Amino acid sequence: MHSSYSHFLQRLRTSVSYLSVSHFPSTSSHRLFSTTIGVFARKKMPLLTESERTEQLSGLKTAGWKLVEGRDAIQKEFHFKDFNEAFGFMTRVGLKAEKMDHHPEWFNVYNKVDITLSTHDCGGLSPNDVKLATFIESIVKK
């Protein structure tokens, strides 16, 4: 093991011991400990069930989203007046994606933006893909 990694682990153990044993009541330290560790061990996002796919993807398909051949993903191409409008759109989507911690695969040339959504953590379409696609549709309609 690298010495810097070993040093990091030792400091983490010391910090957790310090927080949980000596300075907080047990219920607070447990919550603090769980919250801290939760950053490292996020819950895996579930795939959409068959009924969720039927229900939630139908509206997106009507809006022009397509299933990607050979992948569990959805894709749509957007066209704008010019690069400035396309870039503004990408900025809005990027800010929302960052808040969701869910980032699209996308490609931009001048006034065209091609977006593919899939959740890498679960290997396919998840509720986050539907949520982000729905947000994208809401800002395109404005």
From Swiss-Prot:
GO BP annotations of the record are: tetrahydrobiopterin biosynthetic process
| Top class in the EC scheme | lyase
A molecular-function term among this protein's GO annotations? 4-alpha-hydroxytetrahydrobiopterin dehydratase activity
What family is reported?
Belongs to the pterin-4-alpha-carbinolamine dehydratase family.
Q: What is its EC number?
A: 4.2.1.96
The protein's name is: Putative pterin-4-alpha-carbinolamine dehydratase
Its recorded reaction(s) are: (4aS,6R)-4a-hydroxy-L-erythro-5,6,7,8-tetrahydrobiopterin = (6R)-L-erythro-6,7-dihydrobiopterin + H2O
Superkingdom as given in the UniProt entry = Eukaryota
Per UniProt, the keywords (alphabetical) are:
Lyase
Gene3D superfamilies attached to this UniProt entry: Transcriptional coactivator/pterin dehydratase
